[in-house]
Amino acid sequence: MAAENDTSRAGSGSGSAAINGDASAERKVALITGITGQDGSYLTEFLLNKGYEVHGLIRRSSNFNTQRINHIYIDPHNALKARMKLHYADLTDASSLRRWLDTIRPNEVYNLAAQSHVAVSFEIPDYTADVVATGALRLLEAVRSHIAATGRSHIKYYQAGSSEMFGSTPPPQSENTPFHPRSPYAASKCAAHWYTVNYREAYGLFACNGILFNHESPRRGENFVTRKITRAVGRIKIGLQSKLFLGNLQASRDWGFAGDYVEAMWMMLQQEKPDDYVVATEESHTVEEFLEVAFGYVGLNWKDHVMIDKRYFRPAEVDNLKGDSSKARKVLGWKPRVGFEQLVKMMVDEDIELAKREKVLVDAGYMDAQQQP
């Protein structure tokens, strides 16, 4: 079920705008990079519920990583219901970006794609910069040139920023807080942020930066610390795992629910003027606090299972991130709905169910219970 030419995957809804025409007369059309990721899947659901037609750009390798959007899938041959469509493209391939902009003719473009793992960015800094920083520049230039060629100046662009850009700057961090990135990923996000500001000021693009603080969900990748914890809690509770290896337990983060945060992305593009916004819960918690809630929720003591592994410490740590989202709350009318403990318990519940299904396969001999490396 991969993308072929125009489409071969599609999502639920009713009606379908013409892919080669300006579909704004029928409904709004959104183009999303990173659609198979955590944020992309929640944003797709949100926009479909708003009546949008959603187009996602995916890489060839994404064919094996579509589980977050599989539940939205509808056979594209059912044109009356299919409103999510996937196309092959890559932020490292400028020609593919411009080609799909010309074909899809979206009203809104959401750039969510990235090599988004901070620790991994130290291992592959060149690739991280190419996708996160230069990739954003390629997409901005594709939007600018598309507008110049077609006159479709109403297109709106959203750039996914990150609280990691603030790095070692003391909290609380707002839109006016200086950036001090502490990783190749964060530095690349800073470049993408300023490219977006530059295209807004130089070319008049309606381009917004969303500086989103950490946002989690049951769809979070398992190599991120929050999901790594809740996945382990589920497996330990079910008897598939005994130990969890982590790094810095005193790192403090402002954690929110990804489903809440994608609404803020959309809200930014509904304003009369483009601007940049911090999106955060304005509460911070340490990794240790996350452990206490997650393990305590299932009646376990995290100290009996967690071991420190120096491999998971970053070369340059970011100690404390806590956002000041007063601007987003005042201007956009946005506020988080899911609190910290509710978020942690939501993730644990999902991972316990996942561990139960895994145990069935282990007990039947179809797979081995893999201890965390």
Regions found by a protein language model. Give the residues of each.
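C-terminal substrate-binding subdomain of Rossmann-fold SDR/epimerase-dehydratase oxidoreductases
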Residues: 2-6, 43, 48-58, 64, ...
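N-terminal Rossmann-like NAD(P)+-binding domain of SDR-like oxidoreductases, especially those catalyzing
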Residues: 2-215, 265, 269, 336-338, ...
